[in-house]
UniProtKB/Swiss-Prot annotation:
To M.jannaschii MJ1503. This is Uncharacterized protein MJ1082.
Length: 120
């Protein structure tokens, strides 16, 4: 069993970790990597690059901002303003995932201790 799990973990990609640990959907991962590879962009620019509609990209960006994977800044235009989005680097994503895994590990250890002490 242990060997099976270790072999599966060796095949994990950063996308798998983002899906599993951060709970991201495919479109959110796609938007993140689009920003990482192509640089910053507005909702409409990103939507065009990932071939999805504006509202889908807006939802993905909101989710990515909530996870700390995307930042935005407000740009004033002749008529109104727009937001420009930028992906944080992969080192920061790794830090976020590591922090979440550490928290999860500590919680599982507490739960197992509780389970052992209270199973009778």
């Amino acid at each position: 069993m242990k060997e099976f799990i270790i072999n599966r973990l060796k095949k994990f990609t950063i996308e798998d970790l983002m899906r599993c640990i951060l709970g991201l959907q495919e479109i959110e991962i796609r938007v993140y990597f689009d920003l990482l590879e192509n640089g910053e962009g507005s909702v409409l620019e990103i939507a065009e690059r990932v071939n999805r509609d504006r509202t889908t990209v807006q939802k993905a960006l909101r989710s990515l901002m909530n996870c700390g994977l995307v930042d935005r800044r407000k740009v004033t235009e002749k008529v109104g303003y727009k937001y420009i989005y930028n992906a944080v680097d992969l080192d920061r994503v790794s830090d976020i995932i590591e922090e979440l895994l550490d928290d999860w590990y500590q919680n599982v250890k507490k739960w197992l201790t509780y389970f052992r002490e209270n199973r009778k």
